[in-house]
Amino acid sequence: MRLNTLSPADGSKHAPKRLGRGIGSGLGKTGGRGHKGQNSRSGGGVRRGFEGGQMPLYRRLPKFGFTSRKAMVTAEVRLSDLAKVEGGIVDLNTLKAANIIGIQMEFAKVILSGEVSAPVTIRGLRVTKGARAAIEAAGGKIEE
């Protein structure tokens, strides 16, 4: 088997419909669009969310809440990810260097998910109560 001999399995690919190629094809003349009307026209059809003049769902439902801009630049870090950081000192820059959080992140919070194996020092990150207990139980410490 070679890359140039690969082909799709029999029956897995269907030929596209050839529209407007005579009445014998079953899709001649109007090409499956019917006669007249908005959808028969070139570029015809209604916009997304349009319900035929009925008040659309996105306008029937109330507005609520907002998107926090701080949440966009805040990352959650699992306890199990802390082992991927070299040196035992974990701060925002070492997390970025280890590709655990994105470069655009400005804040990080360590959460209790997984286990911490080696003692680590956390600097300048927020830590949940459960994660704090697990880090201190493993011999690590948290510096604000």
UniProtKB/Swiss-Prot annotation:
**Pfam name, any one:** Ribosomal_L27A
State one molecular function term (GO).
Answer: rRNA binding
User: Which residues lie in Gly residues bias regions?
Assistant: 21-31
InterPro entries, from UniProt?
Answer: Ribosomal_uL15 (IPR030878), Ribosomal_uL15/eL18 (IPR021131), Ribosomal_uL15/eL18_sf (IPR036227), Ribosomal_uL15_bac-type (IPR005749), Ribosomal_uL15_CS (IPR001196)
One GO term of the cellular component aspect?
cytosolic large ribosomal subunit
What does the UniProt keyword field contain?
Ribonucleoprotein, Ribosomal protein, RNA-binding, rRNA-binding
| Chain spans, region Disordered | 1-53
Which superkingdom is the protein from? Bacteria
Q: In Gene Ontology terms, what is a biological process of this protein?
A: translation
Instruction: Please state which protein family the record places this protein in.
Output: Belongs to the universal ribosomal protein uL15 family.
NCBIfam families annotated for this entry?
rplO_bact
Q: What does this protein do?
A: Binds to the 23S rRNA.
Q: Assembly and partners?
A: Part of the 50S ribosomal subunit.
Q: What is this protein called?
A: Large ribosomal subunit protein uL15
The major lineage groups are: Bacteria, Pseudomonadati, Pseudomonadota, Gammaproteobacteria, Enterobacterales
The coding gene here is: rplO
